[in-house]
Amino acid sequence: MFDSTARTRTAVLATTGALAAVVTALGVTGPASAAEGSTGTAVTTTVVDPNDALLRASQMPVVNDVQDWSRVATRHSRVSTAQPESLSALGFSDKARRDFAMPGGRATNVVLTFADAAAAADAYAEVKAWRQHTGDNIPAGGQLLFTDKVKPVTVQQGRGSYFSFVFKSDKSSDEGTFEWVGVTRRGSAVSIVDWRVNGADATYDVDPTIASVQAANIKLARVS
């Protein structure tokens, strides 16, 4: 059903050689920092998802087998660092959100439903265009290091894609943040999968965002 022709590659939180070079230059090769996204005593999210359209923790991307997401209380922050304005600007009719965390990482899945497929298609294009804003919300004193191109994802029905970028919250830090934004549209619904990690390295055959975007697309059949 899905494209399985991707080549095996070794990467340090990377989908391209260029991104790997950025990470090598950073010296970010140690274990993930617990500073951001630590689960601590987080409360389970209370978001209502009657159609089971949101991804489970096990369906969210990870870069190795020892990483494990935990659901946390729903955040009210941006879905992505690259998000230029409130999600309400996308014009959705309904929204469900689920947030996750692990030591050194955080992730979010949002499902948006729209009045019709045309409105959903416009929103899908807008989320892809977040790539133009990867440096907009980096903290003062930080630095955008790399933004990858938007890559298509073969999905069951509709459209899917993702992009990644790397930034430092503090230019003097030896550690960077690596973030991926995946999005898929099916009928009149859109699902956004965003995840970010600090200071981890991994070897994988295909970018783990791909499988999550594909799973999100399948789940959209329940609301589109």
Model region roles, listed by residue range:
Residues 95-128:
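A short acidic-to-branched-hydrophobic micro-motif
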Residues 196-224:
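Surface-exposed amphipathic alpha-helical segments
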Residues 94-99, 178-185:
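Short, surface-exposed beta-strand/loop micro-motifs that present aromatic residues
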